[in-house]
Amino acid sequence: MNRNRMIRVMIAAIATMAVVMGIIVGCGPEWGDGAADSGAARTAANGGTRNAVSVTLPSYYAKNMVFQRGKSITVKGAATATDGSNITGKQLTATIIQGESSDSATARIGKNGTFSCSIKAQKASLKPYSLMLSYNGSIVYQLSRVYVGDVFVAAGQSNMELNYTQYYSTKDVAYNFGNGLITERDLPRQLVDSNVHFVIADHVAGGTSADAKTGSKTSDDFPLVSAYNESSSWLSANNHDSRHLSYLAQQFAMQLRAKHPNVPIGIIQTAWGGTPISRHLRGGDIYANHIAPLRGFHVAGVLWYQGCNDAMRSAMAMEYETNMTALINQYRTVFGQEDLPFLYVQLARWPNYQYTQDVRFAQLRTLNNVGLRNTSNVGMTVSIDTDKGTSALIHPLGKDILGARMAAQYLAMTEDSDNDGASGNGSTGSKASRNIPSGPIISSARHAGSDGADNGSTNNRNGSSAGNGTNGNTDNGTIVLTFRNGTDNGLKAMKPNYSKTASATVPNYAKHPKATPLDGISHVATNTSQALQGFEVADGSGKWVSVNATIKGNQVVLSSANENLGGMTQVRYLWSGNPSCSSILYNKLGLPASPFIAVVD
């Protein structure tokens, strides 16, 4: 046995002996049950030793929790002396153990009793670790079963929160099933996987203390739903408990687990139905209670589906791009990573709010907003073709398709890939950023013959343009649309399948190791020879007329037998809350183009 291995064995042996002694003298919680329960937080007291302390960690530190692989493990909390003595400046030691291996870090107790330390990053493993804190050589807190894998925050409103317990087994069952439009048989396949663990934030409004860094009100702890408190642990995705978890998060996790079967998945669900984005931003109560308490806890990425409430009023829709940009920046700050993967869903078809298309466009423009501190690893999933014919429902079907598309984006962001579709965010800094699977994203609209060149930014609605050219020869009366580089490969017309036969399953990676989650999507759309639909143009009067659209290479050319397009100043595509076209634009990945509105140069 070499010297380094001998040292590791000795450390593990000493730690194990300390745990055993803690159990024997009754100075720690029962082994296997995590720390003793004390209200919302979990505490453990070393009641029989000199200078004994009681330690409290945040409520989401509990057995079955998942720490992020490849990143340092933050251990934070508060300590008080049980005999009232002053322990300011004293040290706690945090240790994580698996088998013969262990790593430790020390934390100095501050004046207010708080402490924080970081243990070095650990490898993903289906085998549990143990986490313990010691003071003066005695165990004062321990969790016997924690995991290291990939952790995601599932945030937003009801289409992210949507789960069986809250939405399909309640008094509103008729509303949620659309009075027979769907049945339980149509709901997404439930995830049953003991290596997926999750915790859900309870709906608690109002902040309770000031965040020193931001000045906004934040909660001291993370509120948890009753299902969590009953078990005092993160729930596992079994037949019973998966009913509480977001369907979209389940489908996303299902895809990642198939791709990486030796990596556990953790989900922290903070979504809250019926909420505007402002409540999720710094200064809002959801940010205060659900996001700020996670500061310093490392995650693999954020999953976001929200915007319906902001489509109710024009003012909210017009502010959405600014708010969405701020939210991405703020969440990345909380989790300590400037290029943290942030995956969000563009609003699905739904006819009932007037400004749905405006929010969709704001979501599109966020991808390349100059306010983003880092445009890498920001991905938008277009959902215009995923509802399986249930667009009359505010919670449409299709979460399996969305989960597969989001998983494909995440894997492209975090792994070396060689896919051909690509960047929805315009970044050219890294291979992963260039290869984020995306449908066609509008880059420029110009009159044929104009001497314009694409500068890679998205058109906006107030007169600025994606192209940097000027009006030129418009004699032929056609308009040429170009799409962002990489998203324009293999443009084609496809007919969306708005029926329940559309689906997404998990690819067989054993047989096809180079497959992606997109390969499991089937019957969502089929090739068609029918002309593209959904394109409209307008002149200065603001009158919109439909036009013909023809694919020519990696461009779309607009023309009209009845209208002279030379004087047209705007173009838009699928500009409706609930478009129902039978031939829409896709690329070679089978991903649909985002709806848009653009100024014509």
Regions found by a protein language model. Name each.
Residues 2-14:
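Bacterial N-terminal signal peptides that target proteins for export
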Residues 33-34, 39-456, 463, 467-601:
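Cell-envelope and extracellular/periplasmic
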